[in-house]
């Protein structure tokens, strides 16, 4: 790789700091004296703004410090010791969270995903298998379904798919949890037909990602039915997810939800990724799936990897069975136009 200059970096979507409006809000409130642990007026106003955006006036809203803590806290708060969580085998909790769910004493009931997604039939199959097993008293019972929007591959659940998952969860008395670490990029995609209000209507809990979507750090957990998860703040504390200076989270989400910034902040990334994806196809590269958000996955042989990595940076997601690399190319709300142009030029041989 060429090290003589800084290469355009598409390795991930959380390399930059925060949106200017978020930073301005933090600076403007820096010397305020506020109560701690999310009880301040900024957190309360941010909660109200989120409730309005989700059309969920009675929702509980909590601010946590990061995605792993959020997933661990929510899953542990919902599940009893003999219960497990159904998840895609490619899901974040199953692949890249260092066994935090298992460390909390809960089994992940993973099932093969297609382009990062599972469906209602998968959930029904797992529930039916457990229910029909004569040894089920010796087995973990499915009680929660975990998905993400977008998925780890940048693909999207359609409204119809989410409605079907929600229906089977209600029929089977399961909870439905949507990881929204990159939710801003889903909301900004022209291919998306799932709104915040839909998430509030169809899920038992979801979270609105900040760390990857314009804040310095932080995620906002939305529980549409008030009081349905008891002692959640206590459980946040137990998982190291409760910030003493909680107003730092409230101020950031206040800025993100004023004037609908969160709903549009992902648009530049989605447009940039669409350009990169089309440029890759024109250059003859194999784009493995048409993910309509801010992530692109492309299969590279050794020569292609060496040629491209000399001009731009990206991450290697995995090695494919045929020996090629699956590269992940990510954009963010802050990706410079000149970096996108540089990527397009890097593909011209």
Which residues are covered by each model-predicted region?
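Conserved N-terminal alpha-helix of the aminotransferase class I/II PLP-enzyme fold
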Residues: 19-67, 89-90, 94, 100
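Catalytic PLP-binding core of fold-type I/II PLP enzymes
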Residues: 157-189
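Active-site C-terminal subdomain of aminotransferase-like
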Residues: 115, 141-142, 146-148, 156, ...
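PLP-dependent aminotransferase-class I/II
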Residues: 105-143, 147-152, 157-164
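Conserved C-terminal alpha-helix-loop-beta "cap" of PLP-dependent enzymes
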Residues: 80-82, 274-348
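General beta-strand structural signal in soluble alpha/beta enzymes
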Residues: 9-12, 61-65, 87-88, 147, ...
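Conserved PLP-anchoring active-site segment centered on the Schiff-base-forming lysine
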Residues: 77-95, 124
């Amino acid at each position: 790789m060429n090290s003589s200059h800084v290469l355009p970096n598409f390795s991930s979507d959380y390399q930059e700091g925060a949106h200017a409006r978020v930073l301005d809000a933090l600076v403007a409130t820096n010397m305020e004296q506020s109560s701690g642990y999310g009880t301040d007026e900024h957190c309360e106003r941010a909660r109200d703004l989120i409730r309005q955006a989700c059309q969920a006036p009675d929702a509980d809203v909590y601010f946590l410090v990061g995605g792993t803590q959020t997933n661990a806290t929510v899953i542990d708060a919902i599940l009893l010791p003999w219960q497990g969580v159904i998840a895609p085998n490619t899901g974040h909790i199953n692949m890249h969270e260092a066994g935090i769910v298992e460390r909390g004493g809960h089994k992940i009931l993973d099932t093969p995903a297609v382009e990062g997604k599972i469906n209602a039939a998968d959930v029904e199959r797992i529930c039916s298998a457990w229910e029909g097993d004569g040894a089920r008293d010796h087995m973990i019972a499915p009680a929660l379904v975990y998905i993400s929007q977008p998925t780890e591959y940048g693909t999207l659940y359609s409204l119809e798919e989410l409605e079907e998952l929600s229906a089977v969860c209600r029929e089977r008395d399961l909870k439905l949890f949507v990881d929204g670490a990159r939710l801003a990029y889903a909301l900004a995609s022209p291919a998306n037909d799932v709104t915040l209000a839909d998430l509030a209507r169809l899920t038992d809990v979801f979270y609105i990602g900040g760390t990857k979507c314009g804040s310095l750090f932080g995620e906002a957990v939305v529980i549409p039915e008030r009081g349905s998860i008891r002692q959640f703040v206590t459980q946040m504390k137990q998982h190291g997810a409760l910030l003493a200076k909680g107003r730092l989270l409230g101020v950031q989400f206040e800025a993100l939800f004023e004037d609908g910034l969160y709903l549009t902040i992902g648009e530049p990334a989605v447009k940039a990724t669409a350009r990169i994806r089309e440029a890759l196809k024109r250059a003859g590269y194999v784009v493995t799936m048409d993910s309509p958000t801010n992530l692109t996955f492309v299969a590279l042989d050794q020569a292609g990897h060496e040629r491209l990595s000399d001009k731009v940076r990206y991450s290697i997601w995995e090695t494919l069975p045929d020996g090629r690399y699956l590269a992940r190319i990510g954009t963010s709300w802050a990706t410079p136009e000149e970096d996108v142009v540089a990527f397009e030029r890097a593909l011209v041989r």
